[in-house]
Regions:
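Short C-terminal tail/terminal secondary-structure segment
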Residues: 2-4, 143, 222, 233-246
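Substrate-binding pocket helix/loop in short-chain dehydrogenase/reductase
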Residues: 94-95, 102-104, 190, 202
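Active-site helix of classical SDR
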Residues: 118, 155, 163
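Short, small/polar-rich loop/turn modules that mediate ligand/substrate recognition or access, typified
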Residues: 171-176, 232-234
Length: 246
């Protein structure tokens, strides 16, 4: 139980990766605050973990609502030890098809929320001289949109930039910042946007011959959240099955 007495906040908790991350952190003894916009789903998720998981429904694209929620959390929890910025909106639209409305929506959820949450939890982490910031990016951040559309790829590239900036600034305070960049995770958000033909084509391009499982991403997050990862900061953990060699 290496995370006993630690409190973690996980966004997008009811998605494939988010659910697996919540399970992994609770299994290591952490108390988890689960964020999701679906109140029924996040409540049901939390009920499965008893008192180890606190459900909170919030639209991460609404900055004012998010800041209000974080103010309430600050009054209930002394410190958030681990922040997992996992929530994301996916779009397959390439450059010409990307509207400004879609661009702003993706940036609000995928990037702005990560910034606001990081700003909210870091002061207590610094005072406590311990903290873990973990950002779920994507192979799209460096693949030029191979696996996703323009707005999504840009937002995930910016997540890596946020990770690097946070890592450099916060290292002297015992706070680490790292990212995980998976490709083609078996989850509704990813798989529902791929036709059977697309799935077969992508499988053929992945050297390991399969898609990534949510539990594999959660395993990486669990390690980055643990005390044993203390010498790692500013690192992007690539999980693409060798796709970069294609």
């Amino acid at each position: 139980m290496e995370l006993k007495h630690k409190t973690a906040l996980v966004t997008g908790a009811c998605g494939g990766i988010g659910r697996a991350v919540v399970m992994a952190l609770v299994a290591q003894g952490a108390r988890v605050i689960a964020f999701d916009r679906d109140i029924e789903a996040v409540t049901a998720l939390a009920e499965g973990f008893g008192g180890a998981c606190d459900p909170i429904a919030v639209d991460l694209g609404d900055a004012a609502a998010l800041q209000a929620v974080m103010k309430d959390i600050a009054g209930r929890f002394e410190v958030i030890d681990i922040l997992v910025n996992n929530a994301g909106v996916l779009s397959p639209h390439k450059l010409a098809a990307t509207t400004l409305e879609e661009w702003h929506r993706l940036m609000a959820v995928n990037l702005d929320a990560a910034l606001l949450l990081t700003q909210a939890v870091v002061p207590a982490m610094k005072e406590n001289r311990w903290g873990r910031l973990i950002n779920i990016s994507s192979y799209a951040w460096k693949s030029g949109g191979l696996t996703a559309g323009t707005a999504y790829s840009v937002s995930k590239s910016a997540m890596v930039g946020l990770t690097y900036s946070s890592a450099r600034e916060l290292a002297p305070f015992g706070v680490t910042a790292n990212a995980v960049a998976p490709a083609y995770v078996v989850s509704p958000m990813i798989m529902e946007q791929l036709s059977e033909e697309d799935r077969q084509r992508q499988l053929a391009a992945i050297p390991v011959g399969r898609f990534c499982q949510p539990e594999e991403v959660a395993h990486a997050v669990r390690f980055l959240a643990s005390p044993l990862s203390g010498f790692m900061t500013g690192t992007v953990v690539d999980m693409n099955g060798g796709l970069q060699f294609g």
